[in-house]
Amino acid sequence: MQRLIEGLQKFREGYFSSHRDLFEQLSHGQHPRILFICCSDSRVDPNLITQSEVGDLFVIRNAGNIIPPYGAANGGEGAAMEYALVALEINQIIVCGHSHCGAMKGLLKLNSLQEKLPLVYDWLKHTEATRRLVLDNYSHLEGEDLIEVAVAENILTQLKNLQTYPAIHSRLHRGDLSLHGWIYRIEEGEVLAYDGVLHDFVAPQSRINALEPEDEYAPHPNSPLISYDAFKVPGKERPGREKATESPAPQLSPLPGFGHLPREQAERIYRGSR
């Protein structure tokens, strides 16, 4: 605590003093252009990894960067998203998971949490779709490899869950909003972004040259909205598989989870999206 109190003084005398104009501007209101949804993990700092300024990001943090499907929970996530979209007119949403995620480790052994961590157990049940998908389709993996897959699949699950919210679904239909999935790899200081055409997590820096300076916060035409199934494990190439050289038009699924969930489960979880 002493270190934090000393930090308060250093902040005021250092950073605040040299950025008075910024804080004067922020005192009159906020105008973030990005909604950043990430994990509560202390190793993840959105402003640090993006090198963004105070006021650039509107942040939602919770264990596992989870967004329950519309109507499934009465937590603050839905309210925060509604405020971001309606009041702040944000047009970009990033869901950012990270390597070595404790929430994903817990998700893979969910039943063992029920007695000792009942609130965590109840929370992680909101991403049962991720757990079932990983256990059913990646039985050949274990340890950190399995956790790595869970982190990636969970990001895609949350992108689908976002689409079950009417305000988001409507804006996506109009082309007024983009969704992005990121993985922050702590040990490498690297961020990978999901590419809906390649079905892979790739370095987002490869897209920078395609953006005009004035469009840096505009909805991105390659936003991963639909084709989430069959992604490649980050950093691992699948034998005999080549990356696409062209960008085919995305094919809409009847339901957000239709690509890799049983239809009955997809309807139960995502029926609010249509």
Swiss-Prot record:
Residues 234-245, 261-274 have a biased composition (Basic and acidic residues). A hexamer formed by a trimer of dimers. Interacts with the first 260 residues of CcmM; both the N-terminal 206 residues and the C-terminal tail contribute to CcmM binding. Interacts with full-length and the N-terminal 249 residues of CcmM. A probable CcmM-CcaA-CcmN complex as well as a CcaA-RuBisCO-CcmM complex can also be isolated. It catalyses: hydrogencarbonate + H(+) = CO2 + H2O. Reversible hydration of carbon dioxide. Essential to photosynthetic carbon dioxide fixation, supplies CO(2) to RuBisCO (ribulose bisphosphate carboxylase, rbcL-rbcS) in the carboxysome. Belongs to the beta-class carbonic anhydrase family. Disruption phenotype: Cells do not grow in normal air but do grow on 5% CO(2), called a high-CO(2) requiring phenotype, HCR; even at high CO(2) levels photosynthesis is less effective. Carboxyomes appear wild-type and contain RuBisCO but no longer have a HCO(3)- to CO(2) interconversion activity. Light-dependent CO(2) transport into the cell is unchanged. PROSITE patterns: PROK_CO2_ANHYDRASE_1, PROK_CO2_ANHYDRASE_2. Zn(2+) binds at C39, H98, C101. One of its GO terms (cellular component) is carboxysome. This is Carbonic anhydrase. Keywords: Bacterial microcompartment, Carbon dioxide fixation, Carboxysome, Lyase, Metal-binding, Photosynthesis, Zinc. It comes from Synechocystis sp. (strain ATCC 27184 / PCC 6803 / Kazusa). Binds 1 zinc ion per monomer, a water molecule forms the fourth ligand. One of its GO terms (biological process) is carbon utilization. InterPro entries: Beta_CA_cladeB, Carbonic_anhydrase, Carbonic_anhydrase_CS, Carbonic_anhydrase_sf. Its EC number is 4.2.1.1. GO terms for molecular function: carbonate dehydratase activity; identical protein binding; zinc ion binding. Residues 214-274 are annotated as: Disordered. Dimerization, activity and interactions with CcmM requires all but the last 60 amino acids of the protein. The C-terminal tail (about 55 residues) inhibits CA activity about 10-fold; it might attenuate activity before encapsulation in the carboxysome.
